[in-house]
Curated annotation (Swiss-Prot):
Keywords, alphabetical: Cell membrane, Lipoprotein, Membrane, Myristate
GO cellular component terms, A-Z: plasma membrane
Record-given protein name: Brain acid soluble protein 1 homolog
Segments traversing the membrane: none
Taxonomy of the source species: Eukaryota, Metazoa, Chordata, Craniata, Vertebrata
Comp. bias regions, Basic residues: 1-11
Entry's Gene Ontology BP terms: positive regulation of angiogenesis
Stretches for region Disordered: 1-197
Ranges of compositional bias, category Basic and acidic residues: 15-26, 35-44, 72-87, 99-113, 134-144, 156-166
Biased composition (Low complexity): 45-66, 88-98, 145-155
Membrane topology listed for this record: Lipid-anchor
Signal peptide bounds: none
Amino acid sequence: MGGKLSKKKKGYNVNDEKAKEKDAKTEGASAEESEAPKENKEDAAAATETTNDTAAAAKEATPTADSNSTAPKEEEKSAAPPKKEEPAANANANAPKASDAKTSEAAKAEPAKSPDAPPVKAEEKSAPSAAPANEKEPAKEAAKDPAPAVAAASESKPDAESKKTEAPPTKESAPAEPITTETSPAPNKEQAVAVQD
């Protein structure tokens, strides 16, 4: 953690970012670490403590998703046993720093993506899987009556928004309708062929 590079000592303009990056790489530290203020590292440590519960569950759900996050090396050395939890917490800290509700929503969204979710997240994962199962039934009804399909879709959207899984239910209900319409024209073609023969 050296001090700022002086203009006279290095022989280049202070605003020259490429030259700074080269010097930082030759010294053995990346440009991001050398320019990062100490306050950001302290904020990341505080965010790690506050999001430990959600980060632990999220890390179990996605073991390698946060490997690209730039965590301070000092934190990794001091907290070696919970090292698996830190990248997830730092990724949440590096993401737009908002309320804990957003981090919990992100943690809820991750188990839906990953197949191996922890037992704690199994309840949350079963709830989103129950919603698509319920939406398949209205999709079947949609083939019969278009009006109930609109009502079923409007009922399922608030549930989907609260679970942050709005896109998959929409995709499931949309293909169900074209499949039924595609199967109905096929017999019509066969009937037309049968009539022509």
